[in-house]
C-alpha cells in the first residue's frame, strides 16, 4: 500500500464500526460527530500535507528499513536532520491546524520503543527488537496513524 490519503484515513475510521459513547450517549456516526470530527480533521491534515509536493521534504522520510518514502510520523529518526525536520513539520502542522494533530505521541513512542528494544535484546538476549522492526515494516507499509 502507498501513502494513505486523508480520505482513506477517514474511511478507515468509519470502517472500524466502533461502539462509542460520549457523555453516556451512544454515538452512531462518530466520524462526523461535532466533538470528534475536529480531531479527525487535524489527523487528516497530516495525510493531506504528506501528499503535497511542496511539503514532501518535511512530511516524508526515507525508511531506514526499506528505503521507501514513508510518512515522517512512521519513521525512526536516524539523524539530527531528521529531528530538525520533525520539529519543522510539527510547526507547519500547528500553523495549518491551529490544534493538536494527534500523532506526535505515537511518533515519539515508536522511536523510544525502537531504542529500548534494541538495548533490551543486547542485555537480556530477547527478540523484541526484531519483532518491533517487523511491526514497523507493517506500520510504514500501511501508513498507520
Predicted regions and their residues:
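N-terminal-proximal low-complexity accessory segments that begin disordered
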Residues: 1-49
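Short, structured coil/loop segments at alpha-helix boundaries
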Residues: 26, 30-36, 52, 103-107, ...
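N-terminal cap/leader regions of alpha/beta-hydrolase-fold enzymes
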Residues: 28-29, 36, 59-66
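Generic short alpha-helical segment signal, independent of protein family or function
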Residues: 44, 48-51, 118, 140
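Short N-terminal amphipathic alpha-helices
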Residues: 47-62
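Glycine-rich flavin
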Residues: 61-145
Amino acid at each position: 500500500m502507498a501513502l494513505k490519503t486523508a480520505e482513506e484515513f477517514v474511511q478507515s475510521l468509519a470502517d472500524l464500526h466502533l461502539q462509542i459513547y460520549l457523555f453516556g450517549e451512544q454515538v452512531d456516526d462518530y466520524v462526523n460527530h461535532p466533538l470528534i470530527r475536529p480531531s479527525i480533521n487535524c489527523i487528516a491534515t497530516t495525510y493531506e500535507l504528506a501528499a503535497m509536493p511542496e511539503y514532501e521534504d518535511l512530511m516524508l522520510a526515507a525508511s531506514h528499513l526499506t528505503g521507501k518514502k514513508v510518512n515522517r510520523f512512521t519513521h525512526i529518526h536516524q539523524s539530527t536532520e531528521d529531528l530538525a525536520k520533525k520539529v519543522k513539520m510539527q510547526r507547519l502542522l500547528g500553523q495549518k491546524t491551529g490544534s493538536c494533530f494527534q500523532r506526535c505521541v505515537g511518533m515519539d513512542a515508536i522511536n523510544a520503543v525502537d531504542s529500548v528494544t534494541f538495548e533490551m535484546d543486547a542485555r537480556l538476549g530477547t527478540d523484541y527488537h526484531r519483532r518491533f522492526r517487523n511491526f514497523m515494516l507493517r506500520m510504514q507499509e500501511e501508513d498507520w496513524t
